[in-house]
Amino acid sequence: MSDTSADPHDVNRGFFFSHVGWLMMKKHPDVIAAGKKIDMSDIINDPVARFHVKYFTILKVMCCFLLPTVIMVYTWHESWAIAILIQCFVRYLLNLHFTWAVNSFAHLWGVTPYDRNVKPKENWGVSIVAMGEGWHNFHHTFPWDYKAAELSYFINPTTLIIDAFALIGWAYDRKIASTNLIEAVTKNRGEKICK
C-alpha cells in the first residue's frame, strides 16, 4: 500500500504532502478503509501500550519538554530562556522533521538496491538523523525484518536498542530476512548500483 492512495503519506501527492501536508488534511477514504483492515488486537491488549495511550499527554509533556528543560538548567547551568528555546522549540521541531523525513526524503531520494520497482529508497541522510530509519528500500522489500536494514549498529541504532531489549526479555520473536533471500531478491529486482 506504500505510495498509493491508501498510504497516509503518499509521496505521489508531492514532497510537501508526504513530509507534513498529510497532517493538515482529512484522511483519504482509502487510508481509512485500509486502516480498518489492520489487526491491532495484540497492541490493544498489551498492558504497556494501554498505559502509554492512557498517559500519553502527561508523559509527553514530562519527557519531551519538562525534563529536558530542567536538566539543561540544573546540570548545564543554562538560563531558563535558552533551555526552553532549545528544548521546547529547536530540538522538538528538528525531531519532528527528522521523523517526517522518513516518509518524504526516503521515498524520493536515494538508491534502490533491493527493489527498483518500489519508490522507497536507501537514504544515508535520513538514516543518520532518524536513527537508522532511512534504509527504506530494504524495509519495504522485507517488511517483516525487524532490523529494517542489513547494516551495523553504528548506522542503524534502532536495531541496537531492539537487540538490547531482547537481552532483557522486552523484545522477542524478532524476524529477519535470510542472506539467501536478500541476495536473490537483490539480484532479480535491485538497482544495479555497482558494476
Task: Give the ranges of each region predicted by the language model.
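Interhelical loop and helix-boundary elements at the membrane-water interface
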Residues: 47-58, 108-121
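Histidine-centered catalytic micro-motifs
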Residues: 1-4, 23, 102-116, 127-146
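Non-catalytic, topology-defining segments of multipass membrane proteins
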Residues: 1-100, 135, 145-195
